[in-house]
Amino acid sequence: MSEFQTEISKLSSNPIWPFFATICSIPHPSKHEEALAQYIINWAKEQGLAVRRDETGNVFIKKPATPGMENRKGVVLQAHIDMVPQKNEDTVHDFTKDPIQPYIDGEWVTAKGTTLGADNGIGMASCLAVLASKEIQHGPIEVLLTIDEEAGMTGAFGLKEGWLEGDILLNTDSEQEGEVYMGCAGGVNAEFTFSIEREAIPTGYVGRQLILKGLKGGHSGCDIHTGRGNANKLMARFLAGHAKELDLRLVEFRGGSLRNAIPREAFVTVALPEQHVAELETLFHRYTELLKAELGKVETHLVTFLEAKELQSEVLTAHTQQRFVAALNTCPNGVIRMSDDIAGVVETSLNVGVITTEANKIKVLCLIRSLMDSGRHQVEGMLQSLAQLAGAELDLSGAYPGWKPDADSEIMHIFRDMYEGIYGHKPNIMVIHAGLECGLFKKPYPNMDMVSFGPTIKFPHSPDEKVKIDTVDLFWQQMVALLANIPVKA
């Protein structure tokens, strides 16, 4: 038994924790979840459960009803196998080979320098705990574990009709105990490609790298309204304000690592006249203090560095640089519109997530989210106009639908009544500004009744990710009670 497994055994008798410890021990970042999928398949077979896999790679496991519950509606428990691979710049970790190193920090479980994978590892562990249990009461159970949710919802897109028999789907990918979700935002990837021209580094120019790091980052849906800094946009702001006066020539812009994570770090390599280096140092320091004044209450660990950099490639031409920097500085980011119908919920947003530089092009990958297709289309149009003005190409891909709330949902009413019966108050019924797979499941299974719930997870998609221990116990209590209260199938 690992150190973590021994440690969490002291938390409670909750069967979720041993499964989560095992999940953490098997690398499973998006696009590299095969080892964990195979482990789960082999484990399920050892339990005598029926296991199937579709051509996309999704895993399906069936468990018969417990005695006396055979006449209940079938329930599909659903989670995704993959996790977001994010680490601090100074953390040495290969997500395809190295296990996550979780530990207990007071009331929370978190990880050493990396994302924890509680999103959606806790939900996945709850599905396995139901399959393993010989004690809880339930009707016919199916477990659906999808692949590649975080990097493109590949598994949900690939789900075909005829694979699931259940009437009700319980999605475990929500991140606030006390809230139950009945709707979510849709989204689309938007990638700019700027074709760039380069020329020789001017005589007398030296290299410097501007580094901005230490931002909180986080989930580009759930955290987009919190006012956190976007490293890509903050660096663009400095370049737009000072490149001309300092004669800065751009060599490389690199920032962010995932379209659905608010970028925490950005790195910009420039060439400039040696006589302007001291002025650059002054202005960059002054800009850092400005950002701390603006964002300091939210971004308590924001830091910048200016380092000498040996130049090994040419600089962008002045025209190429001007149109790229102007476009990036102009590009909208963050909350576009709040919902008029649901108080406190973001309706439409944009995250300028990842910027990469190659020899002859710069790519900027964004993620648009919206509760309404019309809101998504509006932002698509804004970005298309920006691309046209900047002479860039814009590719829109991977569009996925939102999950429209159903006020008549039977399982929602059952969850609400169950929750109130246990805790004496109703849960908050919510719509989430993030992409749950439920919206995609509605296409092959339009009559499936769905809700989403889970424990409290803070700062998902960032190395600060953590899950609150006591809410995992509450999550399990709710899962057990909900399964026992599934109605008889008509």
Regions found by a protein language model. Give the residues of each.
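Acidic/His- and Gly-rich active-site-bordering loop/insert found
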Residues: 2-107
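Zn-dependent metallopeptidase/amidohydrolase metal-coordination segment
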Residues: 8, 13, 340, 347-360, ...
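Midchain, well-structured core segments that form catalytic/ion-binding scaffolds
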Residues: 27, 107-110, 150, 157-369
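Active-site metal-coordination/substrate-binding segment of hydrolases
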Residues: 69-151, 156-167, 321, 329-339, ...
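Acidic, glycine-rich active-site loops and adjacent beta-strand->loop/helix elements
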Residues: 81-83, 108, 144-152, 174-177, ...
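His/Asp/Glu-rich mid-to-C-terminal helical/loop segments that flank catalytic regions of hydrolases
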Residues: 162, 228-245, 274-277, 323-329, ...
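Active-site-adjacent substrate-binding region
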Residues: 223, 230-232, 236-253, 405-448
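Substrate-recognition/cap regions that form aromatic- and gly/pro-loop-enriched pockets
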Residues: 345-434
